[in-house]
Amino acid sequence: PKKSAALTATLEFVKRVRSKDPGIGGMKLWLMYRNEFGTSQAFVGRDCFCAILSKYKLTIRKRFRAPRTTDSSHHLPQYPDLTRTLLLEHPDQLWVSDITYITIWLPDGSYVFCYLSLVTDAYTKEIIGYCVGDTLGSCYTVEALEMAVRRIAAKEIKGLIHHSDRGVQYASADYIAILRHNGILPSMTEDGNPKDNAIAERVNGIIKNELLQGMRFSSIQEVRKAVATAVHFYNNERPHMSLDMLTPVQAGEMQGPIRKRWISYREKYLNVALA
């Protein structure tokens, strides 16, 4: 009976979390499970937990990253990369932005795309601005930026950098004007290497290929509703290996370097070079 109760509790927990985050991996599931059931009689160990995921076909296949949605073939002003030697030490030091696409299926079986613009705090990994638009027009990236800016309206922020690719949306006069008006320094990648905007690319992938995994949308309204739910879960409940398994909201209370659950060779190099 005790084993049966533990199995039932474990399966119900996985089902509940996966209803909010269909693509969350086994390690994060295990850590969330341990936090919730660690002192309960229904608690099972890590190996048993992984065996349950495998037996009941609850493991997740890795997905490929989405194609880029950047058009940098324009003649608007571009800006140097200010992040190459930057070490993150506090919130609102660096924001990163990017765009990804989401498929909408039409009744006749054809499909169109809508586009999700995200602004993320690079230190906390919190999504602080987002907008879903039916085109790649700059008005949607502007709306995401305005959401992020409202967060800092009552704060005294100095030296905040906004980093993006060189897409026309981020180089547009309206977008740059908002950055300038709020004392935010524009920074852009210097080539097409996704690693130059890696945090933004990673967050795109988490939202699209993990939190929205397996969802089939028939309207942009459905996408907007699902994205709002996904962002709330991502910010408030999903632990991050890059944040020592804190959530982004929890990381917002931190100062100084946050321990990662892997080796960051970039940060290791910069710490030595700047010592």
Predicted regions and their residues:
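RNase H-like DDE/DDD metal-dependent nuclease/strand-transfer catalytic core used by mobile genetic elements
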Residues: 38-46, 51-60, 72-78, 82-228, ...
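Basic, flexible linker segments flanking DNA-binding modules
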Residues: 1-91, 193, 249-258
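Residue-level detector of intrinsically disordered/flexible regions characterized by low predicted structural confidence
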Residues: 4-5, 30, 64, 197, ...
